[in-house]
């Protein structure tokens, strides 16, 4: 009954360098997306105040 041995892979712990690289890449990607979102909101706000200053729009409702 002495069957053959099955070769099992050796389980290793997480690679610290790999974890650091993955964390850094994900952090930079998320930061870049957040910055792009922030710049877009800033552009919208600046355009709104430019139109408000030119008198093209108003925040007061016209009474007719």
UniProtKB/Swiss-Prot annotation:
Superkingdom classification of source: Eukaryota
Gene coding for it: COX5C2
Chief subcellular location: mitochondrion
Lineage start: Eukaryota, Viridiplantae, Streptophyta, Embryophyta, Tracheophyta
Family of the protein in this entry: Belongs to the cytochrome c oxidase subunit 5C family.
Entry function: This protein is one of the nuclear-coded polypeptide chains of cytochrome c oxidase, the terminal oxidase in mitochondrial electron transport.
Listed GO CC annotations: mitochondrial inner membrane
Native source organism of the sequence: Helianthus annuus
Transmembrane region(s): 15-34
Protein name (record): Cytochrome c oxidase subunit 5C-2
Keyword Transmembrane helix among UniProt keywords: yes
Protein location: Mitochondrion inner membrane
Keyword Methyltransferase among UniProt keywords: no
InterPro entries: COX5C
Keywords attached to this entry: Membrane, Mitochondrion, Mitochondrion inner membrane, Transmembrane, Transmembrane helix
């Amino acid at each position: 009954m002495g069957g053959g041995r099955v070769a099992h892979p050796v389980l290793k712990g997480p690679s610290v360098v790999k974890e650091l690289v993955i964390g850094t890449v994900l952090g930079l990607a998320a930061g870049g997306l957040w910055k792009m979102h922030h710049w877009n909101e800033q552009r919208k706000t600046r355009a709104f105040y430019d139109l408000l200053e030119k008198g093209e729009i108003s925040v007061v409702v016209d009474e007719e």
